């Protein structure tokens, strides 16, 4: 089983607690609003696989390294991670067509800074908003 450390909205804020929380993880996923590429560098220093997307506050240093949307598969689970995705019945209009055409099993998105986990019955996918890790 792959263990995932999930965070978002660090806004350039580093907390050593990230390393404690993620020490037993196999991968670390950052769902955008990283703020500074130094956050990624510190996460990468753990030697764990890093997956990320850029958010609306991220500059070119982050946007040059990570996509707006990241679709991938982990242990046969299809994942779509993006920063501004919306919520069940209120998805971002920019992604709704693709989301309904080819929904992932797991949809990770943020922007509200409030951690939530919901199951979208209509698309049969788990929706996770990790909330804000920064200040």
Can you annotate each of these PLM segments?
Residues 12, 36, 86, 114, ...:
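Short active-site segment of divalent metal-dependent hydrolases/proteases
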Residues 21-24, 73, 100-102, 122:
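Flexible, charged surface loops at secondary-structure boundaries
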Residues 13-14, 41, 60, 81, ...:
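A broad, structure-centric signal for solvent-exposed, well-ordered loop/edge residues
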Residues 51-97, 101-102:
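Helix-adjacent hinge/juxtasegments
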Residues 6-8, 27-33, 51-56, 81-83, ...:
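Active-site neighborhood of phospho(di)ester-bond hydrolases with catalytic His/Asp-centered motifs
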Residues 1-5, 71-80, 120-127:
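Beta-strand-turn-beta hairpins that frame and shape the catalytic cleft
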Residues 1-50, 58-69, 76:
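N-terminal active-site segment of His-dependent metallophosphoesterases
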Residues 51, 89-135:
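Conserved beta-sheet core of the metallophosphoesterase superfamily
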